[in-house]
Amino acid sequence: MGQNLSVTNPLGFFPEHQLDPLFRANTNNPDWDFNPNKDTWPEATKVGVGAFGPGFTPPHGGLLGWSPQAQGVTTILPAVPPPASTNRQSGRRPTPISPPLRDTHPQAMQWNSTVFHQALQDPRVRGLYFPAGGSSSGTVSPVPTTASPISSTFLKTGDPALNMESISSGFLGPLLVLQAGFFLLTKILTIPQSLDSWWTSLNFLGGAPVCPGQNSQSLTSNHSPTSCPPICPGYRWMCLRRFIIFLFILLLCLIFLLVLLDYRGMLPVCPLLPGTTTTSVGPCRTCTISAPGTSLFPSCCCTKPSDGNCTCIPIPPSWAFAKFLWGWASVRFSWLNLLVPFVQWFAGLSPTVWLSVIWMIWYWGPSLYNILSPFIPLLPIFFCLWAYI
C-alpha cells in the first residue's frame, strides 16, 4: 500500500490484510488473503475518511477488488494519434475530363446549322430570333463571342441581386400611408361620438348627461346617452343623432370639394340671375378662344354664342360659384333676399365694430374650440386634397 494515495484504514483491516482474529479468520487458513500485492501498510492503524464518505473505502483488494483503480493506482495512457490522412499521402487527384457531348447528349448533335437555317424559314421561329423590323433574309450572321473562355467557364451568372433598398422603400411608403390613414380613420370615427356628446350636453345644462333608460347589465342603472345599449329606448335616438352628424360631415366634405374644384378651375359655373337661364349682363369682352378650348384655370365664366366665340364675364371662379349658389338659393327661398341689406350693412361696418367682433371671438374662443376640436382630424385630409388636386 506504499503507493496507495487513498485514505487510512476505514474498516479496521490489519497491515497484512488479515481479518480481525475476533472473527477466527486466522485459525485454519492464516493465508486466506490471496492478494498478490500485499505490502506493509503503516497507516492501517489509523481511522480516516474514505473516498465515498467515512469508513466506506476498504484498502487494497477489499470490496473493490484487486484492480489498480481499487488500490489507488491510476495509470494514464497516452492518447492514440489519429490515422494519417490518405489524401495527404497520395495528393489531390485531377478532375477527370468530361466525356464528349456526342456521348452525353446525342440529341443535341442532331440540331446542326442546316436544320437551324431550315427552321428559320418558318415565320414563327424567325420571330423568336429577329425583332420587328430586323433582317428578313434566311441567312444568319454569327454573333462574335466577346466573353473570354475563362469567364465563360468559371463565371456562372444567375439571377440578378435584389436591390433591398428599392424593395424596402417600396414597402415603406405604402406602410406609412396605411398607418397615417388608419390613425386618421380612428380620429375621424371619434367625431360623431364627440358631436353626439356635445349635442346631448345641451339638454343637461349644469349637470352630467345621463340616460334614464335600461341597459343589459342592470334594468335600473343609468348610463350615458351616447352609449345606449340596443334594449334602451334611447338607442334609436342615439342612432338618429349620429346619422344626422354623418350627413353633416359628408355635406361639409362635399362643400369643401366643390370649393376646391371651383378654385382650381375644374368647375366652370356662371352666375345666373334669379328666374333666368342666361348669364348676367355686365362688363363683358369677347374671347379669342372657342368654348371647348378653354384653359384649365379659367379666369372668367364663358358661354358659347352662335358665332363660335365665347363671351367671358370677368368674375373670379370662387365669386362666380358663390353668386351662383346665392342665385340658386334665392330663387327657391325668396326670404333669403331679405338678408341682402343686412349683409351689405355688415360689410360696411366701421373698424370699431370689427374689433368688437374680434373681441367676442377671443372671449368665446375656448368654447368654440371645444366644439370645433372634433373636426381637427379632417384638416390633414383637406390639406392633401388641396395640394394634390
UniProtKB/Swiss-Prot annotation:
GO cellular component terms attached to this protein's record: membrane; viral envelope; virion membrane
GO biological process: caveolin-mediated endocytosis of virus by host cell; fusion of virus membrane with host endosome membrane; virion attachment to host cell
Record field: transmembrane: 171-191, 243-263, 338-358, 365-387
Chief localization: virion
Keywords associated with the record: Acetylation, Caveolin-mediated endocytosis of virus by host, Fusion of virus membrane with host endosomal membrane, Fusion of virus membrane with host membrane, Glycoprotein, Host-virus interaction, Lipoprotein, Membrane, Myristate, Transmembrane, Transmembrane helix, Viral attachment to host cell, Viral envelope protein, Viral penetration into host cytoplasm, Virion, Virus endocytosis by host, Virus entry into host cell
Virion surface side: 2-170, 264-337, 388-389
Positions of the UniProt region annotated as Pre-S1: 2-108
Post-translational modification: Isoform M is N-terminally acetylated by host at a ratio of 90%, and N-glycosylated by host at the pre-S2 region. Myristoylated.
Region (Pre-S2): 109-163
Lipid addition sites, N-myristoyl glycine: 2
Domain notes: The large envelope protein is synthesized with the pre-S region at the cytosolic side of the endoplasmic reticulum and, hence will be within the virion after budding. Therefore the pre-S region is not N-glycosylated. Later a post-translational translocation of N-terminal pre-S and TM1 domains occur in about 50% of proteins at the virion surface. These molecules change their topology by an unknown mechanism, resulting in exposure of pre-S region at virion surface.
Entry function: The large envelope protein exists in two topological conformations, one which is termed 'external' or Le-HBsAg and the other 'internal' or Li-HBsAg. In its external conformation the protein attaches the virus to cell receptors and thereby initiating infection. This interaction determines the species specificity and liver tropism. This attachment induces virion internalization predominantly through caveolin-mediated endocytosis. The large envelope protein also assures fusion between virion membrane and endosomal membrane. The middle envelope protein plays an important role in the budding of the virion. It is involved in the induction of budding in a nucleocapsid independent way. In this process the majority of envelope proteins bud to form subviral lipoprotein particles of 22 nm of diameter that do not contain a nucleocapsid.
HAMAP family for the chain: HBV_HBSAG
Protein name stated in the entry: Large envelope protein
Organism: Orangutan hepatitis B virus (isolate Somad)
